[in-house]
């Protein structure tokens, strides 16, 4: 009983909110960025204090009107006004409590981290040993190796863990004060948005109009009848299209033995918008056996081989032509070389004869009688041959 009396006294002291306060709270409710979470088993919306202050400083109440001062001039004035809203129970302060993981999961994560760090250290030791061997053989690359080691030392040894959002829950805060910062405040004030109000009003009017259909004029009833028939035909045509596309797919699939998958309007029954359900017009996929693919690959490889052989034959022809031109050039050089050799041979023979003649002149005194007789006999034989040659043409003339 005492607590209820205290609560009533607080309400009386605070009083009911004014129109201006309701307008500010409504603006803040629909324009300040909010998030939803669970609190005490209920789904609630919450906002952050600093974002609420920024939102109100950008509002129309932060601009001075003619003959009136601006309601919000500084961040402190916004904080004071939000304290008033908090006291009038538009929202209340909450405490963000992070959910702790069980001990088993933490132990497993630590063990995994240790195992990964041990493997990385082993890999690093192997890499360092290989680097030391290379540095001994190649002294010039020591500077590059030191730079790479410095870069590796700068990077952390363990791999970066994936950033995961930590789960938390909200609990009511003991100190109900509005503070500018990252403090969390849960909304209590939940007014009806104008859009939801308008949609509900239109729905109610439509239901009332449908119930009063017999009282409509004849022209309106005929028009509504044709509209309903058109809508029914449209829905029926979509259903028929869905069935027809399945039948077409089955026919093509059976004829081709399951190799061709053809879909007409593939997104017709998909969870997409009205326009996207008619895009694309069709899709086609080939899912044939591997043998056909191998045959195609073989045919392509044969074509490539033929093309390569033709290129090789062309290159060989070019090489033969180049070889012929080189042979003709070499033959010309060899002919000139042969003439030179013949000239040198004739010169050598003349030199030998001159030497022989000079030798005979020098060794004249040393010739024996037998050699003189042989020379005289040879001279006689030569004279006889000359006479025979002279006598032969005379006989021929006679």
UniProtKB/Swiss-Prot annotation:
Gene Ontology cellular-component terms listed: endoplasmic reticulum; endoplasmic reticulum membrane; membrane
Comp. bias intervals (Basic and acidic residues): 101-155, 289-327, 337-355
UniProt keyword Endoplasmic reticulum present: yes
Keywords: Endoplasmic reticulum, Membrane, Protein transport, Translocation, Transmembrane, Transmembrane helix, Transport
Domain of life: Eukaryota
InterPro entries: Sec62
Protein's cellular compartments: Endoplasmic reticulum membrane
Region named Disordered: 101-167, 289-398
Topology of the protein relative to the lipid bilayer: Multi-pass membrane protein
Bias type Acidic residues, positions: 373-389
Membrane topology, Lumenal segments: 218-234
Family affiliation: Belongs to the SEC62 family.
Subunit-structure text: Part of a complex that contains SEC61, SEC62 and SEC63.
Functional description taken from the UniProt entry: Required for preprotein translocation.
Protein name: Translocation protein SEC62
Gene name linked to the record: SEC62
